[in-house]
């Protein structure tokens, strides 16, 4: 089996088609935050990883993949209750928030980008991409969801963007052990091709990183 470290959001949105392009391979996936996926490489526990860091792990090659776009979203009812006057610092500090795991800093980064302040709202820890989305749809809290998963909900009105003009793009990278690179060349090609079809060109300057 090929052991990989991958973010949950990438797995839920675009990685599976890449794996399907190399049906001769079997996979053992370690799901982790993209900010820390490279630690699996440093420990020698995986052959490759989708990471959120442009710095190359020792003994690895790095390939930029593009960026996943995230949108701060909530249900219409939640918006009326907590954000009647928009996502102000006061409102964000009081509104329940979704967090994937303690490693997930995306919501905090978005709030600081939006308000200029470091806020600590009440939050739910919910380490599941689809539960994260369901929680937003059902009005439990707001959270940063991949645009690929929420675009239809935004069109239908089931979800509302807290600020439609303030998306966040999370750059992703494919890092692979040089020792394993020749044997995994078909997988690398599949990853790069699939990423090019699904991800956005990364922002010139971006430090926003998440579980995905």
Spans of model-derived segments:
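A late-sequence structural motif
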Residues: 14, 164-203
């Amino acid at each position: 089996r090929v052991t990989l470290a991958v973010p949950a959001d990438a797995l839920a949105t675009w990685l599976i088609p890449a794996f399907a392009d190399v049906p001769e391979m079997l996979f053992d996936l370690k799901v982790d935050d993209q900010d820390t996926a490279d630690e699996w490489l440093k420990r020698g526990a995986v052959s490759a990883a989708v990471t959120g860091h442009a710095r190359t792990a020792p003994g690895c090659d790095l390939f930029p993949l593009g960026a996943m776009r995230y949108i701060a979203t909530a249900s219409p009812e939640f918006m009326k209750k907590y954000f009647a006057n928009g996502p102000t610092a006061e409102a964000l500090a009081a509104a329940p928030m979704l967090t994937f795991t303690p490693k997930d800093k995306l919501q905090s980064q978005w709030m600081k980008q939006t308000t200029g302040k470091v806020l600590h709202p009440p939050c739910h820890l919910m380490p599941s991409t689809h539960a994260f989305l369901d929680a937003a749809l059902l009005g439990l809290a707001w959270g940063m969801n991949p645009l690929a998963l929420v675009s239809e909900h935004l069109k239908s009105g089931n979800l509302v963007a807290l600020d439609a003009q303030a998306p966040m793009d999370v750059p992703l990278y494919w890092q692979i052990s040089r020792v394993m690179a020749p044997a995994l060349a078909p997988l690398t090609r599949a990853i790069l091709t699939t990423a090019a079809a699904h991800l956005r060109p990364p922002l010139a300057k971006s430090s926003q990183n998440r579980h995905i």
